[in-house]
């Protein structure tokens, strides 16, 4: 079944190529080139826009990003350690001191 689909798709591609649908040369002139305008950094006239003002959030950024994700990471690791201990995969022992 898969081989038949491959044969049919190749035959369809060849028929479209013969009809000029896929391999036809472009009718656009290569002498006219379109220059893209990057509106984020330049105006339509080509001048560079001034650098935008940077707004610093400082401690607000620390409190809203770092601290909640540290707390979530702590909860995940605590729950995973409890799961390992519950299934006797890793049980910490105090008898490891062989000094």
Swiss-Prot record:
Q: Which residues lie on this side of the membrane: Mitochondrial intermembrane?
A: 78-99
Main location group: mitochondrion
Return the transit peptide range from the UniProt record.
1-39
Give the location in the cell.
Mitochondrion inner membrane
Name the membrane topology term. Answer: Single-pass membrane protein
Q: Name one GO molecular function term.
A: protein-macromolecule adaptor activity
Q: Which GO terms describe its biological process?
A: calcium import into the mitochondrion; mitochondrial calcium ion homeostasis; mitochondrial calcium ion transmembrane transport
Spans within the Mitochondrial matrix topological domain:
40-57
What transmembrane ranges does the database entry give? 58-77
* Key words, A-Z: Calcium, Calcium transport, Ion transport, Membrane, Mitochondrion, Mitochondrion inner membrane, Transit peptide, Transmembrane, Transmembrane helix, Transport
Query: Which family does the similarity line name?
Result: Belongs to the SMDT1/EMRE family.
- Subunit organization: Component of the uniplex complex.
Q: What is known about what this protein does?
A: Essential regulatory subunit of the mitochondrial calcium uniporter complex (uniplex), a complex that mediates calcium uptake into mitochondria. Required to bridge the calcium-sensing proteins micu1 with the calcium-conducting subunit mcu. Acts by mediating activation of mcu and retention of micu1 to the mcu pore, in order to ensure tight regulation of the uniplex complex and appropriate responses to intracellular calcium signaling.
User: What is this protein's record name?
Assistant: Essential MCU regulator, mitochondrial
Q: Tell me the organism.
A: Xenopus tropicalis
């Amino acid at each position: 079944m898969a081989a038949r689909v491959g044969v049919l798709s190749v035959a369809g591609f060849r028929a479209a190529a013969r009809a000029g649908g896929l391999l036809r040369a472009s009718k656009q002139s290569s002498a006219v080139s379109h220059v893209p305008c990057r509106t984020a950094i330049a105006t339509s006239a080509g001048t560079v826009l001034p650098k935008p003002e940077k707004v610093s959030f400082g401690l607000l950024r620390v409190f809203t990003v770092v601290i909640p994700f540290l707390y979530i990471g702590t909860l995940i690791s605590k729950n995973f350690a409890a799961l390992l201990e519950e299934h006797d995969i890793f049980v910490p022992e105090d008898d490891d001191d062989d000094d």
